[in-house]
Amino acid sequence: MTVYKVPQKEFAFILDEIVGYEEHCKMPGFEDASRDVIDAILPEAAKFFEDVVAPTNYLADSQGTQLIDGVVQTAAAFDGVYQQMIDGGWCCLNGSTEYGGAGLPGVIDVASQEMLQSSNSALSLLPMLSRGVIHALNLYGSDEQKNTYLENIITGVWSGTMNLTEPQAGTDLSAVQTKATPDGDHFLISGQKIYITWGDHELAKNVIHLVLARISGAPEGNNGISLFLVPKYLPNTDGSIGRANDVRAVGIEHKLGIHASPTCTMAFGDNGGAIGYLVGPENRGLMCMFSMMNNARLAVGHQGIGLGERAYQQAAAFAADRVQGRVAGMPQGAPIIHHPDVKRMLMQMRALTEGGRALSFYAVGAEDRSHHHSDAQQRERGALWVEMLTPLVKGWCSEVSMEVASLGVQVHGGMGFVEETGAAQHMRDARIFPIYEGTNGIQSLDFIGRKCLRDGGEGLSLLLLEMDTTILTLTSKSPAIVRLRTTLERSVTDCRAAMAQVLANPDDAPAVAYSYLMLFGNALCFWLLVVLAAAAQRRIDEGATDRFYSQKIATASFFGSQILSRNQGLLQAVYDGSASLDLIDAGDLVSA
């Protein structure tokens, strides 16, 4: 295991060249978030996560969580760590100043999120779910709910959860059976939820559950589901902690990964009914919940990149130290990092991680604009970008995080298969990312359906025009940039061909949705890496000698050659449609 180092130079370069931070921080609400301020905050965040949180990763995974006499006990490695996060203000940097937050742009918060996610994926889920609760309450909570709950959740003193899933209601939430019975100014909630991340714990002083339930007499299906706020402890009128509510953890899952995150089965109302408060309109719970879900989906994409960065750093350090075999032109006993195939694997890890990071920051930058830009048209465009990019960030980034983590094990060789190195933990932890907060199959259907077919490809066409604009700006005579321009032109052509094929054959969309999402994800990440490479080339032309800039060009070139080339196969899969799937019946998949 190696020491994690925050890629601060990466963050700074992306803020400059992808986000355009000098203009970004001039938007209303960000007046106190100048570049000078951010340049002071991010190094402090880096120091905290490197020194305090990152060392907990392996130990907390080994310790896991336990349910003892009805009480969830988290890993001893976390003792005092979460409180230090609260004290440092690191739980939610973009929380509203009206409710005790720092009010920083989302692009700064996502940098902090990545630091936490690289440091400890399991712990990162605690503030991640709280952010979703904050988002939902900001949009749909009453003034009383906001005043009672937001400040404590934003600061991390209280945490939040999302309670959707039941044994019979996973992706299909129309089957939710948890009941809500009116009782004066509140409701009594009864039922059971499963797979609730950080559903109960002792690190925060209160746990605020957002719960999907059906009010007595409500319509069947999705149109009869409402959203309720159910606190673990009922706040007193002065905001202090009051009596315990009728909600408790009755089980903890034993999982493949993220062992230090308590994944709970939650029982509501075993002793008469848990007091809950309606959030948003009756029977519109899914609408309210999906505002929280979309926030979580972006966060899972960021989480994949954070884990990928940690896995890459560990694999690169191991390869630089591990001496094995001979390399032409070097003395016997060369570190394996000099072997071409090991270099390939490390570059693959690096390119996928850096591409995903650029995509994540681009999406969050658009989200900032959707809320804060002074121009209504820019706000509208930002909202459109977020809508289109959310399934890509969640789907593509979580898929490649598994690939990166697996390559990390491979670089370690046999030692990667041994738990004590820590490489295996990254692979175990990454496996959940394509599953939770909406499986990647669902993300693919969302992307191809709502983001392409529903508007006839209008939104995606606008995004492709942005890529066309980049192509026009690539005027450098550098051979590397010339090659990148040619490759980007071909990539945009492939995207338009895939979109035209889907629009002409909408019935094939479910069968090709995954290939379609991955094709666009590859293309968009390559585009943003080219933007960074072109900026790096300009710095080199101006006399910069830092190898960081030549590395940006090398990374984009590798992505274009070794990863973007996958799009030829993905495009062919889109062209083939459902033909190969139609050759076999579903029943044949389970018959001998």
Where are these regions (language model features)?
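A glycine-rich, basic-preceded beta-loop-alpha segment at the flavin cofactor/substrate interface
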Residues: 195-197, 234-250, 255, 262-296, ...
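A structural-propensity feature for long, helix-poor, extended segments
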Residues: 131-133, 142-145, 437-439, 447-492
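Glycine-rich cofactor-pocket loops
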Residues: 29-32, 62-75, 284-299, 313-350, ...
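C-terminal amphipathic alpha-helical interaction region
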Residues: 454, 470-592
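Internal maturation/activation junctions in enzymes
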Residues: 78, 129-130, 141-178, 182-185, ...
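Amphipathic, small/basic residue-rich leader segments at the start of a protein or domain
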Residues: 1-124, 144, 148, 368, ...
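Alpha-helix capping/hinge segments and adjacent helical runs
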Residues: 2-5, 89, 188, 258, ...
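A short core secondary-structure module
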Residues: 186, 190-244
